[in-house]
């Protein structure tokens, strides 16, 4: 921090560890934001991918341990926690999902826990994980963004997966004709076939925008809230590195206050992502508009 300006410090913490095709024709890691940008579409955010997979495996291992230790007698703390979580998600699905599917509840549970774990990385002090990456790599300038949900590629990827399920179940339940009819015959209709034909482009435009808005809103809502939260933590860290005693003291107070408040944010954002997924899939299972 001492060798960086506040602006450089912030930019460094908001840059991903990117692997891709370098300008010299070789494959490797980008060391600057400009190099990462030049890599284009086929660049991989290694930090986002690594943390997403690692946290997904942690989720699977925790629930596998709970399942193996499950007993009909006196349950342990882990079993109690998992049962409460499963009951909570199952209740949310029963309240909001009006179709019949054995997939929705496990999907909702996976989304909630996985997104929560990715969000929770934001509670780790902002310098710890990047400094660990520097020690492992031996590169003092290597960028490393630790929170996957502050990367729009991660949130958009999850949202597009949900969107694919929306399209799949819409066609499965309503048929291809019903799905096309839903996009072209609503919200405006007429008994006159000629008028109805004229309304098809208007209906399609409105319904298509509504359909596309679902994954975009899912992705941007999660990304925006988590990115803003991470930026606040980074700005507080800048206070610590200011060299001014009173500003560092204020940073300590703000760090703890924001961390406590942020626990609510990371939980709420995971819950909202899960609930919107349930609602969107419930709408896809409805055989009427």
Curated annotation (Swiss-Prot):
It is a multi-pass membrane protein. F-type ATPases have 2 components, CF(1) - the catalytic core - and CF(0) - the membrane proton channel. CF(1) has five subunits: alpha(3), beta(3), gamma(1), delta(1), epsilon(1). CF(0) has three main subunits: a(1), b(2) and c(9-12). The alpha and beta chains form an alternating ring which encloses part of the gamma chain. CF(1) is attached to CF(0) by a central stalk formed by the gamma and epsilon chains, while a peripheral stalk is formed by the delta and b chains. Disulfide bonds: none annotated. GO terms for molecular function: proton-transporting ATP synthase activity, rotational mechanism. Pfam families: ATP-synt_A (PF00119). It comes from the Bacteria. The gene is atpB. It is found in: Cell inner membrane. GO terms for cellular component: plasma membrane; proton-transporting ATP synthase complex. Key component of the proton channel; it plays a direct role in the translocation of protons across the membrane. Its main location: membrane. This is ATP synthase subunit a. Belongs to the ATPase A chain family. The lineage of its organism: Bacteria, Pseudomonadati, Pseudomonadota, Gammaproteobacteria, Pseudomonadales. One of its GO terms (biological process) is proton motive force-driven plasma membrane ATP synthesis. The chain crosses the membrane at residues 43-63, 101-121, 160-180, 193-213, 232-252, 259-279. It comes from Pseudomonas savastanoi pv. phaseolicola (strain 1448A / Race 6) (Pseudomonas syringae pv. phaseolicola (strain 1448A / Race 6)). Keywords: ATP synthesis, Cell inner membrane, Cell membrane, CF(0), Hydrogen ion transport, Ion transport, Membrane, Transmembrane, Transmembrane helix, Transport. Gene3D superfamilies: ATP synthase, F0 complex, subunit A.
